[in-house]
């Protein structure tokens, strides 16, 4: 079996969960304060990786860049599934 046929495994430190939550909260507040639609801007950043979607206000741009985008997406998916169903994520 070639390495391309194997499933990749991601595992993040549990301490990063709170950090990601705190970062997203700060970013959300900064975007609201600037008058942007926070959800659209965060999605734009996550899809493109372009930090221009995130303002410098409250150091939001630097904070969000401390996390890998896949780490943020993983925490968002876990949070969604826990809220939607009683899933052990």
From Swiss-Prot:
Where does the signal peptide begin and end?
none
Taxonomically, which superkingdom? Bacteria
InterPro entries the record matches = IreB
Q: Which family does it belong to?
A: Belongs to the UPF0297 family.
Would you tell me the protein name for this molecule? UPF0297 protein lp_2275
